[in-house]
Amino acid sequence: MLRSLHSSSSSDTDNNSGGCKNNGGGGGEAAAAVEGGGDQRAVAAAAPSTRDLLLACADLLQRGDLPAARRAAEIVLAAAASPRGDAADRLAYHFARALALRVDAKAGHGHVVVGGGAARPASSGAYLAFNQIAPFLRFAHLTANQAILEAVDGARRVHILDLDAVHGVQWPPLLQAIAERADPALGPPEVRVTGAGADRDTLLRTGNRLRAFARSIHLPFHFTPLLLSCATTAPHHVAGTSTGAAAAASTAAAATGLEFHPDETLAVNCVMFLHNLAGHDELAAFLKWVKAMSPAVVTIAEREAGGGGGGGDHIDDLPRRVGVAMDHYSAVFEALEATVPPGSRERLAVEQEVLGREIEAAVGPSGGRWWRGIERWGGAARAAGFAARPLSAFAVSQARLLLRLHYPSEGYLVQEARGACFLGWQTRPLLSVSAWQPSSS
């Protein structure tokens, strides 16, 4: 069994900010052993931990020593053997594989695995399995839905702009709640969802499923697919040539197919979306573009770095970023280990198609922006003219009830802080959900 990838304390990750050589000697010794060109037995004799070897690989990759970086990744892959061991083995396998893919791409021996900062999309089966066996997506959807439900209460026409609609699993519970709260004298309100995504066929299937569900509960409903260009996360009706902050800052009229009506109450949903935006300028431009729509509420759900991400807009130092990512995903894999039966095919699919691909993106060329955390999202939202919309006590109690009913492990924890609701494993926050509205000032 491989030695744990989790740092012994939050300071361990901070000590990696200058590369592996500052990792208490362990990462530097591992890098030196691998860089020296010794065989695997010589490296093993130095007894570096798996974490040290992965940090060494990142350090060597960053410094351009691709052969040594490849050797470090191969040592971990040989020890982990497959993604079917215990949590530490499986996590080591995915990080070593992600780093090896990046080495190969940089050396010109492979292709770039991911474009931009987005993870390759998982199959619908793996995505839905993740939604069932782990609480992260359901927690984000439930908490965001409650904030939206409260913000649109009493509206006769509701428009939801979902920037990452995927399979639309977030919306049936909200549509049901809206229908049940309808005034009997007036009937249910009209609901329109504009669902954004990069795959036209997936969006069309999502729209068909949501229309069928809305018909079953007698809710007036419309779904409009909105394609995102593969080159940018700015909305387009058809993937075009606009890129970066300029496209994100474009007006709603310029985003063909994105229509707004003055009598609609608008909610903008950004669940696992903002990390796809390239940098501070594009994030700021996107949020200003959203504010120009005058939404009643904007919901944001993103990963948390657990204190290891620092205050910067990116984590450009690759060893430090790998350390932060290992701490985060170590907790995620431990949670799955504790709550999903051993040998579960669903867990294997989730770890390979969802988490493994997230790890590829997180350590990829654009992955540094994944770890901004609530401080960065919140600061950018305030700078764009938004104010926090506190989550209600009922929203938080619903999140806790979700865990008690469906994920009863004592390891999961829901906390309120800084105007957001956090889901964590043990003491490490892994995901935050917050709600925002245009400030009155």
From Swiss-Prot:
Keywords of this entry: Developmental protein, Nucleus, Transcription, Transcription regulation
Region described as Disordered: spans on this chain: 1-33
PROSITE patterns (alphabetical): GRAS (PS50985)
Residues covered by region (VHIID): 127-195
Single annotated GO MF: DNA-binding transcription factor activity
Keyword Transcription regulation attributed: yes
Ranges annotated as biased composition (Gly residues): 21-33
Organ and tissue specificity: Expressed in a small number of epidermal or subepidermal cells at the leaf axils, in axillary meristems and the entire tiller buds. Undetected in the shoot apical meristem.
Region of interest: SAW: 364-437
Domain GRAS: 41-437
Protein location: Nucleus
Sequence motif VHIID, location on chain: 158-162
Bias-annotated ranges (Low complexity): 7-20
Keyword DNA damage listed: no
InterPro entries for this protein: TF_GRAS (IPR005202)
Gene Ontology terms: biological process: meristem initiation; regulation of DNA-templated transcription
Region span, Leucine repeat I (LRI): 48-126
Region: PFYRE, residue numbers: 266-361
Region (Leucine repeat II (LRII)): 205-256
GO cellular component, one term: nucleus
Family: Belongs to the GRAS family.
Function of the molecule: Putative transcription regulator that controls rice tillering by initiating axillary buds and promoting their outgrowth. Rice tiller is a specialized grain-bearing branch that is formed on the unelongated basal internode and grows independently of the mother stem (culm) by means of its own adventitious roots.
Domain notes: The C-terminal part of the protein is important for tillering. Mutant moc1, in which the last 124 amino acids are missing, is mono culm.
Protein name: Protein MONOCULM 1
Source species: Oryza sativa subsp. japonica (Rice)
Phylogenetic lineage: Eukaryota, Viridiplantae, Streptophyta, Embryophyta, Tracheophyta
